[in-house]
Amino acid sequence: MAKRSKAYLAAAEKIDADKLYSPLQAAKLAKETSSTKMDATVEVAVRLGVDPRKADQMVRGTVNLPHGTGKTARVIVFAVGEKAAEAEAAGADVVGAEDLIERIQGGWVDFDAAIATPDQMAKVGRIARVLGPRGLMPNPKTGTVTADVTKAVNDIKGGKINFRVDKQANLHFVIGKASFDDEKLVENYGAALDEILRAKPSSAKGRYVKKITVSTTTGPGIPVDPNRTRNLLEDAADA
């Protein structure tokens, strides 16, 4: 196990590991316990009661965070002709087809999201082994395989995020930066949680949301009450 810094250990002492915090309390604590002087990213990890090995229990989806992520996503688009021009006009960072595929085959993955027009998907399939494990493979279910490239680029640049359960039944997503107001972090958290609850597979049995942890990228995890799904901003007095 990696040795923790003094700043991390001091931050961890502020957290009661046996307590389940409200989302608002967790947002405040995450900002207080960030162990970096930079504007840290605030992240959420959710453990779900599903079996990802079963196709009918794969949880995935998208959510437009009301306050964005605090980061302008770097977006690439696989398109040609008129659709390529539309993607460039919408603000896509890199647009291409064969040339872009070859660049990625060469090891370049410096982007946060990938969009493709339907006619390009057969070609993009050649780099599925590169994009898939990174959660970057365009998919119709997340709106990233589409003819409306303008909307897709604008959505992602505006704070749209994807979530997908991993092999351990965990979801990871960003809700903002430590510089965000507490309320904005909580509202982003609530928007994402709502979508995750809506994505519950009908075949999932027992408790769906088992565990939630909030942290900054370099800070300690803060356990959040998974039963708190409504009225998330009510804890101002005791947070």
UniProtKB/Swiss-Prot annotation:
Function of the protein: Binds directly to 23S rRNA. The L1 stalk is quite mobile in the ribosome, and is involved in E site tRNA release.
Stated name of the protein: Large ribosomal subunit protein uL1
Organism whose genome encodes this protein: Rhodococcus erythropolis (strain PR4 / NBRC 100887)
UniProt-listed GO biological process terms: regulation of translation; translation
Keyword Ribonucleoprotein: yes
Keywords: Repressor, Ribonucleoprotein, Ribosomal protein, RNA-binding, rRNA-binding, Translation regulation, tRNA-binding
Family: Belongs to the universal ribosomal protein uL1 family.
Keyword tRNA-binding: yes
InterPro entries in the cross-refs: Ribosom_uL1_bac-type (IPR005878), Ribosomal_uL1 (IPR002143), Ribosomal_uL1-like (IPR023674), Ribosomal_uL1/biogenesis (IPR028364), Ribosomal_uL1_3-a/b-sand (IPR016095), Ribosomal_uL1_CS (IPR023673)
A GO term from the CC aspect: large ribosomal subunit
One GO MF term: tRNA binding
Subunit structure: Part of the 50S ribosomal subunit.
SUPFAM superfamilies the UniProt entry points to: Ribosomal protein L1
